[in-house]
Amino acid sequence: MEKTLTIDGKAVKFKTSAALPRLYRETFRRDVFLDLNKARAGIKKKNASADDLPVETLEVIENLAYCMAKYADPSIPDNIYDWLDQFPTTAIYTVAQDILIMWNEEQRTLSVPKK
């Protein structure tokens, strides 16, 4: 799935597929499924704005957004810091919900179980 989202007035492409967990692991040496489970727990506890979320949760959102953007556009810098530098400090969190929705859509079961 590909989608273009606007971050601080800039159009940014994002892409998800079965390859994304591998890209995340290769980029950050971490498991995206474990990271997202922890992030979800932080979001559910707080149920608030980015200002109230734990730093670890915000970092997972940044990492996932970066991987999805890099996957959609390989010309994006290889360093996440260089990519994040083009946005104001909290701008990336404005698309966090869209990014998580894209991730969830990619993960849902496409066939109905027979039993």
Predicted regions: what they are:
Residues L20-P21, A41:
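Generic secondary-structure boundary signal with a strong preference for alpha-helix termini
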Residues P21-R22, E26-F28:
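N-terminal first-folded block
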Residues K15-S17:
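Short linear motifs in exposed loops
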Residues M1-A11, R30-P54, E59, Y71-K115:
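Charged interaction scaffolds used for protein-protein
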